[in-house]
């Protein structure tokens, strides 16, 4: 039988905010019920307008770029920390380019706020926190892929990244607690704190 299985995986502490599931749920409904499924850009345009009230009709296309732009992922970070399997690394340049792409997307997301109705603007906050976390993971990937020297400059940069991760975790925990109970939050905190400690070691 033909059908659609629409899932929201909770691996590695389920780091994603619940709001991020909305577009996937709409995709699932459209693919299940529509006799003619719009092309990707068109369905994203429709969702932007109908679900978010985005008069520019571009928001969901911007969001769609996020998940394909990072190279050192949360799954990579968890697997490498827990040593469950070998995690191959890209070059420092690949991670640097990924961080730059994510910064550009963050700028587009900030710009998109002006096209949203007031009641929808607050939803962008969760995406901005997620993007910042992804950018920091690319910087972590650069450290892991780079020369592990302990000169003063490198040490200072590593300590600065550790501090950025901890500040990000503070914001992330506040966001988590605004919609969820503690649940798996301690696992996410453990991963971030372990890497922060490692960066300072």
PLM regions with names:
Residues 1-201:
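Substrate-binding groove of N-acetylhexosamine-processing glycoside hydrolases
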């Amino acid at each position: 039988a033909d059908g659609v299985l629409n899932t929201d995986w909770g691996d590695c502490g389920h780091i994603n905010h619940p709001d991020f599931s909305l577009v996937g749920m709409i995709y699932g409904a459209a693919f299940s019920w529509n006799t003619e499924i719009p092309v990707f850009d068109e369905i994203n345009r429709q969702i932007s307008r109908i679900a978010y009230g985005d008069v520019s009709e571009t928001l969901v296309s911007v969001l769609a770029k996020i998940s394909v732009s990072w190279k050192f992922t949360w799954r990579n970070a968890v697997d490498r920390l827990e040593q469950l399997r070998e995690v191959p690394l890209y070059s420092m340049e690949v991670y640097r380019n990924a961080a730059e792409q994510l910064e550009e997307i963050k700028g587009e997301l900030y710009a998109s706020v002006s096209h949203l109705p007031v009641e929808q603007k607050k939803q962008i906050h969760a995406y901005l926190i997620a993007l910042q976390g992804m950018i920091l993971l690319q910087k972590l990937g650069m450290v892991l892929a780079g020369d592990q020297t302990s000169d003063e400059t490198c040490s200072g940069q590593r300590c600065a990244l550790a501090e950025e991760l901890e500040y990000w975790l503070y914001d992330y925990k506040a966001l988590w607690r605004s919609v969820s109970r503690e649940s798996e939050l301690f696992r996410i905190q453990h991963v971030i704190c372990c890497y922060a400690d490692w960066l300072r070691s």
